[in-house]
């Protein structure tokens, strides 16, 4: 008896492209809900929602991401335009401002109801309260909308350029460019908003705000500011606000704690220690300004490398963009009201322990071993302990 020959299906490129995998997943804080995002190698992803029994309760496609609210009562999903639609519009050379935008779905887990907000440009969800902040439409529409997820309360603010929630504590910051229009004047500056207290002005100014950062509880807020946009690369100043009071200046480029010719840099994030007693920020040598008095073709373009240099020329080229943004960590002690420069050019790499609370920090440097590493392949480092009380490094 002849066995029937079975032809095996050949794996095609379409099969590979459509193969799905889990790219994101989360469990609600109360443990009763789970979502997972299933995405093909190329195509539209889907977010699936399951209850604690493993039953699928809802799905959202095409989806970009999802998050549970802190109360476990809502799932917030970002729905994006379908890939096929987007590609067809791009082939027609549709202008960016006419392309479809993302939607935000607020799904009530208990009521099995959803609310859709169209034309979302950006949004942020509070980690500790059921509050959402978002901006809609093109960049010309700078209004910020802040609302409770259940829709019980909402406010809006005009001419907003940046915003964000504190990690803990239901408080939001936003920066406003302001408006001089007679019919509706708006103050330019940095504000906080809390549902129970409303808006509070922390700093008034039409300049550039950078790297706004809360401490974990939202009681303190630090930021960089420059009154002149064109000078932001070289003239940023560091400010801090405590307990929603008007911000005060901590340091500017003239601070004696910094090496001569150094400035405060926007290329390192501002961050508080976990106990909010220290504020870490970045400094760097003042960047060289481009010579605008000479045409580019008239500038000398000579590249020189010496064999005694510790890093090969090709590696230097590869690292150039990163090195131009290199920063060196400094710290402000809120109790003593003093600033200390921790990292330096000779000891550039800093590690702190216990989320910045520990009395010790570790500085490392590979500069003495760079040339040796070219031949051996491995990179050695010198290590130094730095005591926060004396701030004098000791080799470890």
What would you call each of these model-derived segments?
Residues 4-396:
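Beta-propeller folds
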């Amino acid at each position: 008896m002849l066995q029937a020959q079975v032809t095996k299906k050949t794996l095609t490129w379409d099969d590979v492209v459509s193969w799905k995998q889990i790219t994101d997943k989360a469990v609600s804080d109360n443990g009763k809900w789970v979502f997972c995002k299933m995405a093909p190698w190329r195509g539209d992803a889907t977010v699936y929602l399951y209850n604690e029994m493993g039953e699928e309760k809802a799905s959202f496609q095409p989806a970009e991401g999802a998050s549970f609210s802190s109360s476990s009562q809502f799932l917030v999903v970002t729905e994006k335009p379908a890939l096929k639609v987007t590609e067809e519009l791009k082939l027609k050379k549709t202008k960016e401002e006419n392309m479809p935008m993302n939607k935000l779905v607020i799904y009530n887990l208990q009521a099995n109801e959803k609310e859709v907000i169209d034309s979302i440009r950006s949004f942020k969800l509070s980690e500790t309260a059921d509050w959402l902040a978002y901006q809609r439409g093109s960049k010309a529409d700078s209004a910020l909308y802040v609302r409770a997820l259940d829709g019980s309360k909402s406010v809006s603010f005009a001419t907003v350029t940046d915003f964000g929630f504190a990690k803990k504590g239901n408080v939001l910051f936003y920066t406003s460019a302001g408006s001089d229009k007679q019919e509706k004047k708006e103050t330019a500056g940095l504000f906080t908003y809390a549902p129970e207290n409303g808006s509070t002005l922390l700093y008034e100014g039409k300049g550039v705000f950078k790297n706004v950062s809360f401490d974990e509880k939202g009681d303190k807020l630090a930021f960089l500011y420059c009154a002149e946009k064109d000078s932001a690369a070289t003239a940023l100043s560091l400010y801090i606000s405590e307990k929603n009071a008007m911000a005060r200046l901590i340091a500017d480029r003239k601070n004696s704690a910094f090496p001569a010719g150094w400035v405060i840099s926007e290329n390192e994030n501002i961050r508080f220690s976990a106990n909010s007693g220290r504020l870490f920020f970045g400094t760097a040598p003042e960047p060289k300004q481009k010579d605008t008095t000479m045409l580019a073709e008239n500038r000398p373009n000579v590249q020189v490398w010496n064999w005694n240099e510790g890093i090969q020329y090709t590696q230097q080229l590869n690292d150039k963009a990163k090195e131009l943004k290199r920063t060196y960590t400094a710290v402000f002690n809120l109790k003593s009201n003093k600033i200390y420069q921790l990292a330096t050019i000779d000891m550039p790499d800093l590690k702190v322990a216990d989320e910045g609370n520990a009395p010790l920090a570790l500085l490392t440097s590979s500069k003495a071993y760079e040339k040796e590493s070219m031949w051996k392949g491995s990179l050695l480092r010198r290590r130094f302990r730095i005591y926060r009380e004396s701030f004098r490094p000791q080799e470890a």
